[in-house]
Amino acid sequence: MALHADLTSLSSTLDQMLERLEAAATDVRGTDRDGLLGDLYEIERHLRSANRRLSRTLTAMQKPS
């Protein structure tokens, strides 16, 4: 199922993006760019929400219809 494989790949990409975003937040915390943290955390929140939704979709795709 090509769609399932594509969505699984997208989920992995989101996981990698979240890791990089966490690293970026760590890098700016306590610096003169500390003001970016609110935006970075908001982006993280949306990406986590999208990843959860994608995970539910992948689970639903595996159930027989």
State each model region's role.
Residues 1-2, 61-65:
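Short intrinsically disordered terminal tails
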Residues 1-28:
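N-terminal acidic leader/helix
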Residues 27-63:
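Short, charge-rich amphipathic interface segments used for partner binding and complex assembly
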